């Protein structure tokens, strides 16, 4: 099935008076960090589109903006067993290899390493020196714990940490497991009272039919930071001693529920939330449920997972591939780019943004509202082949700026969007350090290294490299032959160099004995002669 006709329908953006509405980070620069292997986050799909002829009312309310910004400082604690293996063959050669093994750090390991990191005394000693024993395979081991800064997102309503690196996308403790079994995440500061945070004024647009009864099923809501959300599941809920609306995506906004929409109070339109209802702001917020939207979600998800498959296979990526990882709706999400051949990610808040077209000479647009004056959208660029790259495949060719996702949505693609560059993840958090301390002619690999003194494994090791084994056997045979010839040569020379007198004495003794023998046999005459 050809995906491009579908993409034209799926990715078409809203057009207002010749301008495109897209979603884009609300900051010009982000905090980037390398993507570790096993990360496969895919964003929520495009928002539902509602009838634009409906009446609209602007509701002014407040939403929490977090005790911290949209990201939180913290550290990833990596632990690994660094192994130097010496394979000392019985016939002489030594084979030295190095490997790094996954090892889950303990709380005490990370606390000690973090304190050393803050003191500036945390160092990487590298691989231990080899220890070799004849005809055996010997491992020298060293446990290394490293700490690296890592920002995560924050759920403003529950205080949970959110990041694709966490199993399930979130963590509520101060010692968080990650999808990488040799790494854990530790926050820089402890969580405080969630209600002590500040609340930001937000304008939420409520749309509804111009005629007919006002019931919750006929409402829809959206803002600069929120996708279009149906009102069927909206309910009234208290948060931090304030009344407000809990929306379909799980988020909440405080407002006066006694104000009216078309002479009907909000409290009379929407029901109270049932006991136990949770409000949340994660990377996986819920959305509307319709057949068309679900089909779109499946297509978006398959394109996103196809990009992650390429990342797992360490294939080069194009700007178009990166664009499939970007969110399609406003709100919290992840951004991706390529830095020095390595895939990086960052937490971002996506806001509705209006641009002139998918390809522009200046990277400017209106953030939040269509009527806002254009402003600079992005200023952080990284090398990508002959071009520069920003978030989610945004390409700077030197002459123009291209948004791949929105160009292909309009059926416009060119060779620039297919420019390839390396964008591999980090296989192991300590691999870059290993390469910096290991000679280039040595080998780094994962898995079990070294064997015990099992004789079967030992013999198998002898013939692991048949060319060297054959040469060694030939050398041993030649050594035996040369040794044998040397011994024979010494014996022959020894015989040749013995004095002649000894042989004469033997002959005289032999003649005398023969004469005595004849005399005893009765031949004296013969003896006298």
UniProtKB/Swiss-Prot annotation:
A Pfam family that this protein carries is Rhabdo_glycop_FD
Asked whether the keyword Transmembrane helix is assigned, the reply is yes
Q: Where is this region: Trimerization?
A: 259-313, 388-410
Q: Where is the signal peptide?
A: 1-18
- Glycosylated residue positions: 181, 340
Report the principal subcellular site. virion
Segments in the Intravirion topological domain: 491-529
Q: Which GO terms describe its cellular component?
A: host cell membrane; membrane; viral envelope; virion membrane
- Where do the TM regions start and end? 470-490
- Cysteine disulfide partners in this protein: 42-304, 77-110, 86-132, 171-176, 195-240, 235-273
| Modification note | Glycosylated by host. Palmitoylated by host.
Q: Which UniProt keywords apply?
A: Disulfide bond, Glycoprotein, Host membrane, Host-virus interaction, Lipoprotein, Membrane, Palmitate, Signal, Transmembrane, Transmembrane helix, Viral attachment to host cell, Viral envelope protein, Virion, Virus entry into host cell
What this protein is reported to do is described as: Attaches the virus to host receptors, inducing clathrin-dependent endocytosis of the virion. In the endosome, the acidic pH induces conformational changes in the glycoprotein trimer, which trigger fusion between virus and endosomal membrane.
Family the entry assigns: Belongs to the vesiculovirus glycoprotein family.
Relate the assembly described in the record: Homotrimer. Interacts with host LDL at target cell surface.
- What is the protein name given in its UniProt record? Glycoprotein
Species the sequence originates in? Piry virus
State the organism's lineage. Answer: Viruses, Riboviria, Orthornavirae, Negarnaviricota, Haploviricotina
Gene from which the chain derives: G
């Amino acid at each position: 099935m050809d995906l491009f006709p579908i993409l034209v329908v799926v990715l078409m953006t809203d057009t207002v008076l010749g301008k495109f509405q897209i979603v884009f980070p609300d900051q010009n620069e982000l905090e980037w960090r390398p993507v570790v292997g096993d990360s496969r986050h895919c964003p929520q799909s495009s928002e539902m589109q509602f009838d634009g002829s409906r009446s609209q009312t602007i509701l002014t309310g407040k939403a929490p903006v977090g005790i911290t910004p949209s990201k939180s400082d913290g550290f990833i604690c990596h632990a690994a067993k660094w192994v130097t293996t010496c394979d000392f063959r019985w016939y002489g050669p030594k084979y030295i290899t190095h490997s790094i093994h996954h090892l889950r750090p303990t709380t005490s390991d990370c606390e000690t390493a973090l304190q050393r990191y803050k003191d500036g005394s945390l160092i990487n000693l590298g691989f231990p020196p080899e220890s070799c024993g004849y005809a055996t395979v010997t491992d020298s081991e060293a446990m290394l714990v490293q700490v690296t800064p890592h920002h995560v997102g924050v759920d403003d309503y529950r205080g949970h940490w959110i990041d694709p690196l966490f199993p399930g996308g979130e963590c509520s403790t101060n010692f968080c497991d990650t999808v990488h079994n040799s790494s854990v995440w530790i926050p820089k500061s402890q969580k405080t009272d969630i209600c002590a945070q500040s609340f930001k004024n937000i304008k939420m647009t409520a749309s509804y039919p111009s005629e007919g009864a006002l019931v919750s099923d006929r409402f829809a809501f959206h803002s600069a930071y929120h996708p279009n959300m149906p009102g069927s599941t909206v309910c009234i809920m208290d948060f931090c001693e304030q009344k407000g609306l809990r929306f379909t995506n799980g988020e909440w906004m405080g407002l006066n529920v006694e104000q009216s929409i078309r002479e009907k109070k909000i409290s009379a339109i929407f029901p109270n939330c049932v006991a136990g209802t949770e409000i949340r702001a994660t990377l996986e917020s819920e959305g509307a449920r319709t057949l068309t939207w679900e089909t779109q979600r499946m297509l978006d998800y398959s394109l996103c997972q196809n990009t992650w498959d390429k990342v797992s296979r360490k294939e080069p990526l194009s700007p178009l591939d990166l664009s499939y990882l970007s969110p399609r709706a406003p709100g919290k999400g992840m951004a991706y780019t390529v830095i020095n051949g390595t895939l990086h990610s960052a937490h971002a808040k996506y806001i509705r943004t209006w641009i002139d077209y998918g390809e522009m000479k200046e990277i400017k647009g209106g953030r939040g509202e269509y009527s806002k004056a254009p402003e600079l959208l992005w200023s952080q660029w990284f090398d990508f082949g002959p071009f520069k790259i920003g978030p989610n495949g945004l390409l700077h060719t030197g002459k123009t700026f291209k948004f791949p996702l929105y160009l292909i949505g309009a059926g416009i693609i060119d060779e620039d969007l297919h420019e390839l560059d390396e964008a591999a993840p980090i296989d192991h958090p300590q691999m870059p350090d290993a390469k910096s301390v290991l000679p280039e002619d040595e080998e780094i690999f994962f898995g079990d290294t070294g064997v015990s003194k099992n004789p079967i494994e030992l013999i198998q090791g002898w013939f692991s490299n048949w060319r060297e084994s054959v040469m060694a056997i030939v050398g041993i045979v030649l050594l035996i032959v040369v040794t044998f010839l040397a011994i024979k040569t010494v014996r022959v020379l020894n015989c040749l160099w013995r004095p002649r007198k000894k042989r004469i004495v033997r002959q005289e003794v032999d003649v005398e004995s023969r004469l005595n023998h004849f005399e005893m046999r009765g031949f004296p005459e013969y003896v006298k002669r």
